């Protein structure tokens, strides 16, 4: 029996990353999840990520990092998370170079355990406008891998990059992702606020998919 290809999954516990985890398992990858505790106000996503990994019996690592310079309303609790904003420009919830940081950890992990692929649930259709969610960013990072690692042939896969939020939700349902266990809200409350970018994009997706969000 051929050996399964090892894959590193960047898992936040949100809708997109959870769908990516289930997608990778469905494709037959030997999945290893990376979960980040980086001082985000919405720490509930961490417990959601752990639940998703445990449900699929996927080994996971929680990486705790500090970004003391903050630079984002997700990190600075004195700053307000924007609500009901027009989806134009880069919002204050953008964390400087976050995906670059996360992918660097994933790349190191991949090299160390011999993983051939890294999967991230980035999306460039229904998104908040973050520059590190664009296809061009991942194309550039692929060059970083080639030039800066011994392994060189590790691939970064973005299976959701061109899907609408409604399409992601339909894929999640097809893959039997427990959507009720995912967490998308940027606020740190016990219930989703319904008005931050992430909540609104999620609601838009369920509405477009003609489904109710449980």
Where are the language model's segments positioned?
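ATP-dependent adenylation/nucleotidyltransferase module used to activate substrates
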Residues: 1-175
